[in-house]
Design a protein with these regions (language model features):
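Beta-sheet repeat architectures centered on beta-propellers
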Residues: 2-171
């Protein structure tokens, strides 16, 4: 696309895209661009999948390029984003049971009429603090976030790139 080399834009999620591509005939796949958030969202699931096992990816354009995240628990067999009569962006998705959801409103969905909290996990890239060859001691970790509802945050640290042969702190 013009001066953009797509391989480097999607390198972080190429394994996920490869899995989707290899199973494309067995999946419901839907996607949309959310203009107001500078995001591209793609959802995929097998026809027999439960809401909990449904997955997706979100790509966000930032000053540092594309950043990617994964989602679980949103079964979107149909997904759309558009502008209403006032020019405000609205986003909706529909599940396999025929329910239609206002995609970015609230803190729960109601698959098949049963309230389900939205679970979220944020994972940073592995950080070497500028020198991968020097051992470091982390004395404290400062977290800043603004939840829009009730939440129960937890913190999980992984050392040496998650190497299972290295003792890791408990979850």
């Amino acid at each position: 696309i013009g001066d953009v080399e797509l391989g480097s834009v999607s390198r972080a999620i190429q394994s996920i895209i490869g899995t989707i591509a290899s199973e494309i005939d067995e999946l419901f796949v839907t996607s949309a661009v959310l203009r107001s958030k500078s995001q591209y969202r793609l959802f995929y699931s097998k026809p027999s999948a439960t809401t909990v096992s449904s997955k997706g990816i979100i790509g966000t354009i930032t000053p540092n390029g594309f950043e990617w995240s994964e989602t679980e628990g949103i079964q979107a067999h149909a997904f759309t984003s558009g502008l209403d009569k006032d020019g405000l962006e609205k986003t909706f998705h529909g599940d396999k049971d025929g329910y239609v959801y206002n995609h970015d409103t609230g803190n729960s969905f109601n698959p098949a009429g049963t309230a389900t909290d939205i679970s979220a996990r944020y994972e940073t890239p592995f950080l070497d603090f500028g020198d991968a060859g020097t051992r470091k001691t982390i004395n404290y970790t400062k977290i800043s976030f603004t939840p829009e509802g009730q939440c129960q945050p937890t913190l999980r640290l992984r050392y040496n790139y998650g190497d299972t042969s290295i003792p890791q702190p408990p979850n």
